[in-house]
């Protein structure tokens, strides 16, 4: 047998043994988590932006399960608050309605002032900023959650949060408020009778 074949067989055998050990250990030493925390975490948007005051979505989910308020996630918006209220069986906080009326903002980089330091890229939790070292940076509008975390690290203050104008392209229809009426097919009905 050649030495290469022996080495391949030995490494394959070691990989198989270590894989079996890891598989056994993952079953034997599995840590059970709270299922309500997992459900809450699946509702949150997973931007890990920290606007809620927690270092990520999982710690905020744990805090909600322990009784914290459900309206601290700006990227999730009103839809997330409603889903969390339904899951937790609580009323929607009144401040959540005020936050929904606020205008959504996104980051805008004044490229003539940008020095390409990449500090904003490192701060962005959703990778909405593109650019390279010593190159101009720009924000991908569709990806930006408006978390404002990129503004503080910028040494030249070239990033500002600007309001997003509502257009037909970014309009969010609330389909639950559109009335749906079932009409019988055999009886013609006038629109005024609805």
From Swiss-Prot:
Its EC number is 7.-.-.-. The keyword Ion transport does not apply. PROSITE patterns: 4FE4S, 4FE4S_FER_1, 4FE4S_FER_2. [4Fe-4S] cluster 3 binds at residues 124, 144, 147, 150. Its cofactor is [4Fe-4S] cluster. [4Fe-4S] cluster 2 binds at residues 114, 117, 120, 154. [4Fe-4S] cluster 1 binds at residues 49, 52, 57, 73. Keywords: 4Fe-4S, Cell inner membrane, Cell membrane, Electron transport, Iron, Iron-sulfur, Membrane, Metal-binding, Repeat, Translocase, Transport. Binds 3 [4Fe-4S] clusters. Its main location: membrane. Residues 105-134, 135-164 form the 4Fe-4S ferredoxin-type domain. Residues 32-90 form the 4Fe-4S domain. One of its GO terms (cellular component) is plasma membrane. GO terms for molecular function: 4 iron, 4 sulfur cluster binding; electron transfer activity; metal ion binding. It is an enzyme of class 7 (translocase). Residues 1-26 are annotated as: Hydrophobic. The complex is composed of six subunits: RnfA, RnfB, RnfC, RnfD, RnfE and RnfG. Belongs to the 4Fe4S bacterial-type ferredoxin family. RnfB subfamily. NCBIfam families: PRK05113.1, rnfB. HAMAP family: RsxB_RnfB. Part of a membrane-bound complex that couples electron transfer with translocation of ions across the membrane. This is Ion-translocating oxidoreductase complex subunit B.
């Amino acid at each position: 047998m050649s030495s290469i074949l022996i080495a391949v067989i030995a490494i394959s055998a070691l990989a198989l043994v270590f894989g079996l050990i890891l598989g056994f250990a993952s079953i034997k030493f599995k840590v059970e988590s709270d299922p309500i925390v997992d459900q809450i975490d699946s509702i949150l948007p997973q931007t890990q932006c920290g606007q809620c005051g927690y270092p990520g979505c999982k710690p905020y989910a744990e805090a909600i399960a322990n009784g914290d308020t459900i309206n601290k996630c700006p990227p999730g918006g009103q839809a997330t608050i409603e889903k969390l209220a339904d899951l937790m069986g609580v009323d929607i906080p009144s401040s959540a309605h005020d936050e929904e009326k606020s205008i959504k903002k996104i980051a805008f980089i004044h490229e003539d002032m940008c020095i390409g330091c990449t500090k904003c890229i490192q701060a962005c939790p959703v990778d909405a900023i593109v650019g390279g070292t010593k190159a101009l940076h720009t924000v991908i509008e569709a990806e930006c959650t408006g978390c404002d975390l990129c503004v503080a690290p910028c040494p030249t203050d070239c990033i500002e949060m600007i309001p997003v104008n509502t257009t037909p392209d970014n309009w969010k229809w609330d389909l639950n408020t559109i009335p749906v009426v079932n009409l019988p097919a055999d009886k013609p009905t006038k629109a005024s009778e609805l």
